[in-house]
UniProtKB/Swiss-Prot annotation:
<dbReference type="GO" id="GO:0005634">
    <property type="term" value="C:nucleus"/>
</dbReference>
<dbReference type="Pfam" id="PF00400">
    <property type="entry name" value="WD40"/>
</dbReference>
<dbReference type="GO" id="GO:0030687">
    <property type="term" value="C:preribosome, large subunit precursor"/>
</dbReference>
<keyword id="KW-0853">WD repeat</keyword>
<feature type="region of interest" description="Disordered">
    <location>
        <begin position="1"/>
        <end position="108"/>
    </location>
</feature>
<feature type="repeat" description="WD 4">
    <location>
        <begin position="637"/>
        <end position="675"/>
    </location>
</feature>
<dbReference type="GO" id="GO:0006364">
    <property type="term" value="P:rRNA processing"/>
</dbReference>
<dbReference type="InterPro" id="IPR001680">
    <property type="entry name" value="WD40_rpt"/>
</dbReference>
<comment type="subunit">
    <text>Component of the NOP7 complex, composed of ERB1, NOP7 and YTM1. The complex is held together by ERB1, which interacts with NOP7 via its N-terminal domain and with YTM1 via a high-affinity interaction between the seven-bladed beta-propeller domains of the 2 proteins. The NOP7 complex associates with the 66S pre-ribosome. Also interacts with NOG1.</text>
</comment>
<dbReference type="InterPro" id="IPR019775">
    <property type="entry name" value="WD40_repeat_CS"/>
</dbReference>
<feature type="modified residue" description="Phosphoserine">
    <location>
        <position position="146"/>
    </location>
</feature>
<dbReference type="GO" id="GO:0000466">
    <property type="term" value="P:maturation of 5.8S rRNA from tricistronic rRNA transcript (SSU-rRNA, 5.8S rRNA, LSU-rRNA)"/>
</dbReference>
<feature type="modified residue" description="Phosphoserine">
    <location>
        <position position="76"/>
    </location>
</feature>
<dbReference type="GO" id="GO:0070180">
    <property type="term" value="F:large ribosomal subunit rRNA binding"/>
</dbReference>
<feature type="modified residue" description="Phosphoserine">
    <location>
        <position position="149"/>
    </location>
</feature>
<dbReference type="GO" id="GO:0005654">
    <property type="term" value="C:nucleoplasm"/>
</dbReference>
<feature type="modified residue" description="Phosphoserine">
    <location>
        <position position="72"/>
    </location>
</feature>
Length: 807
């Protein structure tokens, strides 16, 4: 019994020592740990590990106690009772009143003597359900070297953009719900400098966690540079490791590899021969068909079993190179309908006329007929004849293949500037000069630009003030009783503004008038210039040839013929002093010609003017000199019907326009310089550009022709804008403008730029179509002329009015 008591006491003491040692270890661990009132994540993890460890130790101790109990069960019941009695006695002794007294010691004092024991083995031991040991290892804490997808973000606002916090002092909230304040921003100058001088690692993005700019670190920049240079990004990898030649690359001759070739390699295979003979027998018997023969059989079978699809799409076959397809028949018209409109049916007179004409001369080979239904239409009787004639045409008529050019039509249209950029030019009618009782055939503008003279079929010449439209002068030059067939054909002011002479062509006469509207000085200068020519022949200043003609009047026949020629030459026109009646009409002198004068044009100096008489033969063109009262006929032979004649603006050249040609003569050398071929059927008028290197001509076949005298004799441009005969064309003296007037009652205004560079062609741009004159008896605008300085246009029409068109 004593021994057993000693054992129990020793067990109790050992338990107390173990408990005291555990308390000491725990106290030492508490000293090592710093507890500040906050539970750290790592501390919690270690506590959890300790709890697991303690539970495992307790389970181990309980298991040992159970084993001891099992051993004690083997003792006898008597010994068990004795032990129980001793334990009860000991228990009564152990329980003391002091243990149940109030303990005033603190937890710190109680744990002051406790010592903790650290275990080196990190594994935790447990048991499975079958009783075997189970080792619970600690959790693995992975280290993320390159992936931070599971890392917690500092700013927990989710997918909300940072722009939602622009008006707030913070940029979001952290995991604890506290605000993340916005970082301080620099001044506008600092932001400007930062945008100019970009810092290293600048990305232009905002960091969602801090609200500041997101810059790349040096490691990230180095990584990007390595990727750009195609280098290794991991420093632990050695790209130049030493080569270990595990297997030799040199083939060695060994007994296993240098075996001699067997004989069967050089002897034909009997097995292959059997297989080949088997295939040959199958081909001979027809069980195997070669691919070529099989293809031929399929094509033959396809041709034999071919069925034409009547309603399928037609497939085009490749024609021969020399094959020309027949041209398609024109589609049927309304006349060929079985139920044509009434206006296509022929009247009895038209049917009779159609039947009386020859078959080859008929406009159509059938008579349009009307049927109430398509089923009532009979067969066409001329179908066989038409097919036969078409076959003859295809067989006998030669045909040529014409390759169609694939050209974009827009590429052929020249790129012209907008008319808005080419102003000024006339666009509206501002003044109407009304008062004439007949057609206004001609008009002319004074060199000063103040007075407008018009000539009409009523036999009057009127002078108008341009700005006000007031009539300031009127004279009647045609007496209907004496000369009923005369008209005022042409009227032209002298280009010299200091004399005020107005030349008027009336029938066969040319009147030089000085209207009393300028003042004494100008009127006196004009009359003096005209009167000075009367003394030219009086004082013996006649040509010697004319004197010789007069002296050889009684000579031989040759002398008589020569004198007759000179006499005719001298009598081409006669300068007559005005009668008293003509003086009352302000006529200073009258030049009488043989035929009707249609056109008149002054030289730029104002001393010469040229007239055109289309019906006068070789004397159709006459040059008159005012200062000497002389008239010359420069041509000995007629060059067709002359329509117009003009002087060159500054060269001694004369432009003569016939019905189809324009000839340029040099008056100083008396030679033909150039012959222009406009290509028109009947020219009406010409005008020369102020620079003298371009010419425009109008024709009665509705065309306006532009000739560049430095280029070929054919037209540079042909303008077909009018619908009827073009009567007049005129260049502006100062501005790059020209106009054309026609019988359709319209006036077309064009912009014409002539470049100094000889390599550039003139630029012609249509600007405006002026309408206002009425068409009377198929006559519209008869004449047009430009103002000397302004972009104003004057026009004369068959509606008895003249108009001023301004910008």
């Amino acid at each position: 019994m004593m021994a057993k008591n000693n054992k129990t006491t020793e067990a109790k003491m050992s338990k107390k020592r173990a408990a005291s040692e555990e308390s000491d270890v725990e106290e030492d661990e508490d000293k090592l740990l710093s507890v500040d009132g906050l539970i750290d994540a790592e501390a919690s993890e270690s506590d959890e590990d300790d709890d697991e460890y303690e539970s495992a130790v307790e389970e181990k101790e309980s298991s040992s106690d159970k084993e001891a109990q099992d051993d004690s069960d083997d003792d006898s019941d008597a010994e068990l009772n004795k032990l129980l009695a001793e334990e009860e006695g000991d228990g009564e002794e152990d329980y003391d009143s002091s243990e149940f007294s109030d303990d005033t010691t603190s937890l710190t004092d109680r744990l002051s003597g406790v010592k903790l024991q650290t275990i080196v083995d990190p594994n935790i031991y447990s048991k499975y359900a079958d009783g075997s040991d189970r080792i619970i290892k600690p959790e693995i804490n992975p280290v993320y070297d390159s992936d931070d997808s599971d890392a917690e973000t500092q700013n927990t606002i989710g997918n909300i953009p940072l722009s939602a916090y622009d008006e707030m002092p913070h940029i979001g909230y952290d995991i604890n719900g506290k605000r993340i304040m916005r970082p301080a921003k620099g001044s506008a100058l600092d932001q400007l400098l930062d945008s100019i001088e970009l810092p290293e690692g600048w990305t232009g993005l905002l960091d969602k966690n801090s609200g500041s700019s997101l810059n790349l670190t040096k490691e990230e920049l180095e990584l990007i540079s390595k990727i750009q240079r195609n280098e290794q990004t991991d420093d632990s990898i050695n790209p130049y490791e030493p080569l270990i030649d595990w297997f030799t690359r040199h083939e060695e001759v060994m007994p296993l590899t240098a075996v001699p070739e067997p004989k069967r390699r050089f002897v034909p295979s009997k097995n292959e021969a059997k297989r080949v003979m088997k295939i040959v027998r199958a081909i001979r018997e027809g069980r195997i068909i070669p691919p070529k023969k099989l293809k031929e059989m399929k094509e033959k079978e396809k041709i034999e079993n071919y069925q034409y699809d009547l309603w399928g799409d037609s497939t085009e076959t490749n024609d021969h190179v020399m094959h020309l397809r027949a041209p398609k028949l024109p589609p049927p018209t309304n006349e060929e309908s079985y139920n044509p409109p009434e206006e296509y049916l022929l009247s009895p007179e038209e049917k009779e006329a159609w039947e009386n004409t020859e078959y080859s001369e008929r406009e159509r080979n059938f008579i349009p007929q009307k049927y109430s239904a398509l089923r009532k239409v009979p067969g066409y009787g001329e179908s066989i004849r038409e097919r036969f004639e078409r076959s003859l045409d295809l067989y006998l008529a030669p045909r040529v293949r014409k390759n169609k050019l694939n050209i974009d039509p827009n590429s052929l249209i020249p790129e012209l500037p907008s008319p808005k950029d080419l102003r000024p030019f006339p666009i509206r009618c501002s003044t109407i000069y009304a008062g004439h009782k007949g057609k206004v055939r001609t008009l002319s503008i004074d060199p000063s630009g103040l007075w407008l003279a018009t000539g009409s079929d009523d036999g009057t010449v009127r002078v108008w003030e341009i700005l006000t439209g007031r009539e300031v002068y009127r004279t009647t030059l045609i007496d209907d009783e004496e000369n009923p067939d005369y008209h005022i054909e042409c009227i032209e002011w002298n280009p010299d503004a200091n004399n005020g002479i107005l030349a008027v062509a009336v029938g066969e006469n040319i009147h030089l008038i000085v209207p009393p509207i300028f003042g004494y000085d100008i009127e006196n200068n004009g009359k003096t210039k005209i009167e000075d020519g009367f003394g030219y022949d009086t004082f013996g200043t006649v040509k010697k040839s004319n004197l010789e003609v007069n002296e050889n009047g009684d000579g031989d026949e040759d002398g008589e013929n020569e004198s007759a020629k000179n006499a005719v030459k001298k009598q081409v026109a006669q300068w007559n002093k005005p009668s008293q009646k003509q003086l009352e009409k302000d006529i200073c002198i009258t030049i009488s010609c043989k035929k009707t004068v249609k056109k008149l044009s002054w030289h730029r100096k104002g001393d010469y003017f040229v007239t055109v008489q289309p019906d006068s033969g070789n004397t159709s063109v006459l040059i008159h000199q005012v200062s000497k009262h002389l008239t010359q006929s420069p041509f000995k032979k007629s060059k067709g019907i002359i329509m117009d004649a003009k002087f060159h603006p500054f060269k001694p050249q004369l432009f003569v326009c016939s019905q189809r040609y324009v000839r340029i003569y040099d008056l100083s050398q008396q030679i033909l310089v150039k012959k222009l071929l406009p290509g028109a059927r009947w020219l009406s008028k010409i005008d020369i550009h102020p620079r003298g290197d371009n010419l425009i001509a109008s024709s009665f076949d509705k065309r306006v022709l532009w000739h560049d005298l430095d280029l070929a004799s054919t037209p540079y441009k042909t303008l077909r804008y009018h619908e009827k005969a073009v009567r007049s064309v005129n260049f502006h003296k100062k501005l790059p403008l020209f106009s054309s007037a026609a019988d359709d009652g319209t006036i077309h205004v064009f912009h014409a730029t002539v470049y100094d560079d000889m390599m550039k062609n003139p630029m012609i741009v249509p600007l405006k179509k002026l309408t206002g004159h009425k068409v009377i008896n198929s006559l519209g605008v008869l004449d047009a002329i430009w103002h000397p300085r302004e972009a104003w246009l004057f026009s004369a029409g068959a509606d008895n009015t003249a108009r001023l068109w301004t910008t």
